[in-house]
């Protein structure tokens, strides 16, 4: 069975499908920040879109009316349930094995501009990028940092399929162009910034950034098997 709590149509209409106090079956075999599965503890929002690969679907954006509704709904849910900004995530992030939605076209930056989700500290990203353009970090380091950020990933030390899938989902969320699943200087810099002290920031409506470091946040281990 598949269900979600809400569906947001392209014209901005919001359909309530499952009461928030009931479990919906939207997250699949999911994991985030050590918690699994996530259906019992999450609220699922499906967003109507034109799939990639459809004849007219390659570059069809999410309409402004739809995104306004999404931002309003996310803000309302987050305020009522005291949802931490770093726990507002996409399906691909909690189930990267074969899932990429909402995809690299989804304008996460709009949620960031509303202060709903954290973003990497731009100054740190620039600093790390200079460093990683000289030499990329090894795959084992990337795996540990991705696990610390919240992803389900095993520390194999190899650029294997599961690592490429997680990197691809990460790229789709945090840079949205050049989604290759391959590590590069910019991807590594984004990962390094997000997992550094004061590396995540929240933006206010004036465009100012403030550090986001939730209480109780801990480094999560990276399993080897």
Residue ranges: model-predicted function:
Residues 28-31, 63-86, 95-225:
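Cell-envelope/ECM-targeting effectors and their regulatory/trafficking segments
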């Amino acid at each position: 069975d598949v269900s979600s709590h809400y569906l947001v149509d392209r014209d901005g209409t919001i359909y309530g499908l499952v009461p928030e106090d009931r479990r919906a079956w939207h997250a699949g075999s999911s994991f985030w920040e050590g918690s699994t599965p996530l259906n019992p503890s999450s609220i699922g929002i499906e967003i109507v879109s034109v799939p990639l690969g459809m004849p007219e679907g390659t570059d069809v954006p999410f309409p402004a009316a739809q995104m306004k509704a999404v931002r309003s709904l996310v803000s309302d849910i987050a305020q009522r349930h005291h949802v931490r900004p770093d726990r507002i995530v996409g399906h691909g992030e909690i189930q990267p094995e074969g899932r990429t939605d909402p995809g690299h076209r989804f304008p996460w930056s709009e949620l960031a501009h509303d202060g709903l989700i954290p973003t990497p500290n731009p100054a740190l990203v620039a600093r790390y990028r200079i460093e990683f353009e000289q030499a990329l970090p090894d795959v084992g380091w990337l795996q540990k940092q991705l696990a610390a950020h919240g992803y389900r990933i095993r520390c194999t030390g190899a650029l294997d399929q599961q690592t490429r899938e997680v990197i691809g989902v990460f790229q789709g969320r945090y840079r949205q162009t050049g989604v290759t699943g391959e590590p590069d200087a910019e991807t590594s810099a984004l990962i390094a910034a997000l997992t550094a002290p004061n590396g995540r920031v929240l933006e206010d409506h004036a465009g100012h950034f403030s550090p986001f470091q939730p209480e109780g946040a801990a480094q999560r281990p990276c399993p080897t098997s």
